Structure formats: structure tokens, C-alpha cells
Amino acid sequence: MPLTFHIYPPYTSTRPYSIISLFTNKRPPLNYTPQQSRFLLKTSLVTSAGAAYCWYRSYTGIAIIDGIAVLTSINYWRDPRYDWRRTMDIWWIYGCLTYHLLRAYKSQYYIGYYAITCFACSLYPFSHYYYNRGKYWNSVYLHSGLHVLANIANIVLYSGYIPPIWENPVVGFLVGV
């Protein structure tokens, strides 16, 4: 049997949820049990320590972005359903990851940051693999590892010098400088 990774968890009903379900009283099923979602909520709060350290190091823009990531994670993991809160959390985290990857370019500890981030991101498809096979605690532990490792990578990044965003050649190319 070939390995397949599904980005979205399977539905428990045959009818997928859509924008129409936002205006009805039908709610998608929980993705995890309350114990599992509390565990993931606690590990996602590690981001607040990284945001506080980032603020302490005077990288206020990055700290604000990380603070919003904490809020979107709390909003999702308090009641993890396949709905708009999940979509908002995922898209905000993708944006944060992209921003951090850009900011890390030519930073003092970019090698350590990129190495730990790559390893952390490699846990994500394995988390989905176990989720789709009904091994939810394995999925929870891998996803929690992603939370912890990604924030360790962020702390490594914040520990050194981070050049201003306008000095990044990718950003300069995009804005035409």
C-alpha cells in the first residue's frame, strides 16, 4: 500500500461542510478529543514564550506577529473543528512561517534556525499520516513536537542579529527596489 498524505482530516459524514454551514446550526465534528486538544493547546502556547523573548530583544514587529499566532492557535485549539477558525489559524501560521523564513535570511543564526525549522516542518505530514489512520495520540505527539521545535527555532533566530526586512533581497525584488 503506497504512502498517501491527506491535507485535511476525513469527514465523519458523507456531506462536506461548506460556507452554507456557517449560517446553520450544523457544526463540523471535533477533530480531536478534549484531552488531545488541551494537550495541543498547551504546546501551542510555547509561542508566547518566544514572542516575549522576541519583544525583549526589541524585534517588536516579529513579536506582534507571533502574538497574533498565539491568539489564532488558542481560538482553534479550544474547540478544534474543521471550520473557519482552523482555516484562519493555518493561513496565519503559513504567513508567519514565510515571514520568519524571509527574516532569517542573512541573520546571525540562520543555519540553526533553518535546520531546526526543516526538522519541525517534517513532522507535519507524519502527523497527518497517523491522524488519517486513526492513531490520534501519535498524531497529537508529532504535531506537538512541531509546535515545540518550531518555537525553539524561533528562539534561536531571535537570539542573534536579524537584519531589517527591507535589506532582504527577496523583499527588495518583490517591491521593486
Question: Residue spans of the language-model regions?
Answer:
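Multi-pass alpha-helical transmembrane bundles in non-GPCR membrane proteins
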Residues: P2-V177
